[in-house]
């Protein structure tokens, strides 16, 4: 079997202008970035706002193994298969962050014969969105520090600056830094730090904004610091929201690419799901829904993180709610949740599948709480045995959830035909009665308690000393009616990454809150979740290179 990049490089791509014709996008509607990438114009986005909205399919997963469970691959393969059975379909996905590409993942554009292309471009600099977001974020930092240096008219307490710089890399050495060192001409010394770009609030804002004016409004509402009398300082106080919007005026336009099978794909925005809301842009998803009859999108990590945030944070900003939720499961992950070590996952173990099924079952029941029909997709691997597959299908049947085996990585669209037909049938025969998990009027404590007890299966929520102080502060500032974005490990329902399966007897501790008032949600930090990842001992970058003819190698 060829590697992902070998498969991608063997495909004869069609010009993107030709690909998008099938969904009614003309040459004058796009802004080309070479032959195979383009951005959708504002004029076209506005022109389709009044069109009929299609069906929305959300792809999520069980709690993943460190290698991931193939959500993006399954999303792409499902969309290709839906097109093959005659459903006019588009994909709306996140764009990768360069940090994880160089770190563990080595790439994030699907895999095998279910990829979005050109994968080298998408995984590296793409159309420059990440750089624009990084620049906007750091321009804000520079302008903020300059304000303090040039007299500090707003009386900003330099000890209470909460806005951090960002870089689109995994770089643990930058988590805590001191800026302004040297002579007085270098600014006022203060503690600072770097987050990874995809954790920036500006990334979240870009992904939730509905148009340029909404983008500007959200940017103006970012809290960057507090004054010496403890009042929040907003971007609008610095009067720089116009400049930040200018930097992002092209980045907000969704990117158009294609799959191996020629399915049009909108790949735009990329917040992490463990430290941010984990969904691609509202603008891309909303536009796709008006261009196609079916739209496949995904939310990061397991359903306890990405899907919960999609349904409670993103969906209220969309023109419709999901018509079906597809939960991706792998037998290797179920066996890991059933107590099997990573080294033994390739060995048949039906008992472990049964034990690990509790994780999938909880995710299915959780998604049903939102009133949306659920389908389970088994992402097939070569080590899966017939006994294990049959066992999993029986277990799914016992809880009355539709289940299909899919081999889209190996077989492309053909490997997802049965899944596509089942998903289409579910949408056509079952109605979605979407409802949020909590109400805006609920307090911050009430919202978090509902997430912890109803989604995670936990007992109680504890608030650390800093979080307790912030609860009153946020209420006084009028921030308590916003949705909650839980920052939690992706490997477990709990805040302990080693507590696998479907644990029940555990509590969650919130150590700190971060106001994302521009994006419109509050981040609750739990466990040891970091907003700037580090690199592994042997980063994927060690295997990357470029040949003399410019061909990339080592991306996967």
UniProtKB/Swiss-Prot annotation:
Binding site for ATP: 65-72
Swiss-Prot/TrEMBL GO biological process terms: tetrahydrofolate interconversion
Domain of life: Bacteria
Pfam families: FTHFS
Catalysed reaction equations from the record: (6S)-5,6,7,8-tetrahydrofolate + formate + ATP = (6R)-10-formyltetrahydrofolate + ADP + phosphate
Alphabetized UniProt keyword annotations: ATP-binding, Ligase, Nucleotide-binding, One-carbon metabolism
Enzyme Commission number(s): 6.3.4.3
This protein's pathway: One-carbon metabolism; tetrahydrofolate interconversion
One GO molecular-function entry: formate-tetrahydrofolate ligase activity
UniProt family annotation: Belongs to the formate--tetrahydrofolate ligase family.
NCBIfam families: PRK13505.1
Protein name, entry field: Formate--tetrahydrofolate ligase
UniProt source species: Streptococcus agalactiae serotype III (strain NEM316)
Chain's gene name: fhs
